Amino acid sequence: MRVRYQVAGMTSILLVIAIGLLWSTRTVNAAADGKITGTVKLDGSAPHMKGIDMSKDPFCVKQHENSPAHLENVIAGPGGGLQNVVLYISEGLSGAEAGQVPSQEPVFDQKNCMYTPHVLAMDVNQKFKVATSDQTTHNIHPLPNALAGNIPWNKSQPPGAPPIETSWKTEEVAIPVKCNIHPWMHGYFVVVKGPYAITDEKGSYTIENVPPGSYTVTAWQEEYGTQTAKVTVAAGKPGTADFTFKAK
């Protein structure tokens, strides 16, 4: 009889622990269900993006026979929405929240002798891949600030080469990327801590998995620099932060 009571008691304890863990998990998930949404626009006319001379490589020329390539420093839609702007939480996250590293691996592709996407954002220590879809050799060369803790590197990727898998150790907004073979190829890696987003072709964005709280959101654009905005996220109610950059 004593053994039966001990087993029953142990079962009850385990059940209580399991319920507690389930409740804790639900609480954490609920806390991270918030989001910050908004738009980023350009006030004024977008600068003309120059065409790119790819005559150095016949393969590259052929990829753009019907659609000439242009620089992508500033891409604005008909309504002024700015594409490729990175939004991230620069103040307000706890250490644990800022230290969470996403499991998904974003991909930076070399396609049609351009970087796709032009700007790739990622978390500190988040693994990402550099791939090549082209039938010509590229040499990718990120140029971080070594004093900030990230180490520059450059690697050749011939046709069919496997993706390069790597990560960055510290925050840096932003790391220029170039190709040593094709001088017109340039892009950026933006390395942050915590949730982030990149604007689409309409200038819209959504930062997911934001716990309730008050934050500073920073918007970064390669030509226009940064802007910040204060935003509050409540349980079940997204925060909103809109930005407008003045055209040069």
PLM regions and their residue ranges:
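Extracytoplasmic copper-binding redox domains, predominantly the cupredoxin/blue-copper superfamily
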Residues: V28-K248
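Intrinsically disordered, low-complexity regions enriched in Ser/Pro/Gly/Gln/His and often acidic
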Residues: L14-V16, V177
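Bacterial N-terminal signal peptides that target proteins for export
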Residues: R2-L14
